[in-house]
């Protein structure tokens, strides 16, 4: 298993500094949020891209994943749909340029117009288009189990990966998202996606006074020990999606919190 640091752990921190920290923490790579208003986006100037790639080489920390936020690949509005598919394709091409292996994708939004089947079919068509580009670039698009999408559950995500039916499109397994957002049990989430998982997001939460509270992995309700016992971890990428960006007051700083997560998972897999 290879361990990846996620820049969501370091809100507002420039990517070179994030690379340096994750290298010091003995991680195996970096997942970079690619969104306007953050330190990295897909229209970043060439000079800044070069600086990031040079830092990746200097600190021996590969860029593993780019994580853009193109929600509306299944929009009923043609122009909006094309804009989002185009953005995902641009992220794929940028990932290839930067030597990355994965691009995170949403499975379309569940708030799009149309029936459930129409929304699902448009998402599948969009991912086939992007998947062809990814196949040519040697990139894998990973569809996340994520709230607000057509792939909230493991069953939904597995169906979408099956319908796309391309080696360049796999599932991004996020048991924390599914446990909190849906009624699907953790074992179903895992087994339904068996053979389709290309990447893992690792995080945790607990319920305090009826409210969700982000926490260090191993201190919450996600059954990571049981999950890891059933996963084939040999060639797997596990990204610590330490959500300091969304929960700044609930999580300790990444410099101490991420190592605690890493230590827990390393001990769990022996």
Please give the residue ranges for each predicted region.
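Histidine-acidic metal/acid-base catalytic patches
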Residues: 1-4, 9-26, 57, 151-173, ...
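Sequence/structural signature of outer-membrane beta-barrel proteins
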Residues: 37, 73, 245-247
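Conserved beta-strand positions in the central sheet of alpha/beta enzyme cores
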Residues: 31, 65-67, 104, 142, ...
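Active-site acidic/histidine proton-transfer and metal-coordination neighborhood
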Residues: 16-17, 55-59, 74-173, 180, ...
């Amino acid at each position: 298993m290879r361990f990846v640091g996620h820049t969501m752990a370091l809100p507002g921190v420039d990517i070179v500094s994030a690379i340096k920290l994750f290298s010091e923490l003995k991680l195996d790579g970096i997942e970079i949020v690619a969104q306007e208003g953050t330190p990295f986006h897909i229209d970043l100037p060439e000079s800044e891209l070069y600086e990031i790639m040079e830092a990746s080489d200097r600190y021996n920390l590969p860029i593993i994943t780019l994580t853009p936020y193109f929600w509306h690949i299944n929009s009923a509005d043609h122009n909006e749909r094309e804009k989002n598919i185009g953005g995902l394709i641009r992220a794929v091409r940028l990932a290839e340029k930067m030597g990355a292996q994965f691009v995170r994708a949403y499975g379309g939004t569940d708030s799009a117009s149309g029936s459930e089947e129409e929304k699902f079919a448009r998402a599948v068509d969009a991912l086939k288009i992007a998947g062809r580009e990814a196949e040519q670039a040697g990139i894998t698009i990973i569809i996340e189990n994520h709230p607000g999408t057509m792939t909230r559950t493991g069953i939904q995500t597995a169906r979408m990966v099956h319908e796309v039916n391309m080696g360049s499109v796999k599932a991004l397994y996020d048991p924390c998202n599914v446990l909190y957002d849906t009624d699907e049990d953790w074992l179903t989430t895992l087994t339904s996606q068996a053979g389709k998982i290309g990447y893992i997001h690792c995080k945790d939460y607990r319920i305090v006074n009826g409210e969700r509270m982000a926490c260090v992995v191993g201190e919450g309700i996600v059954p990571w020990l049981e999950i890891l016992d059933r996963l084939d971890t040999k060639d797997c990428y596990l990204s610590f999606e330490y959500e300091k960006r969304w929960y700044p007051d609930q999580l300790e700083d990444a410099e101490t919190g991420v190592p605690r997560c890493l230590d827990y998972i390393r001990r769990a897999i022996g």
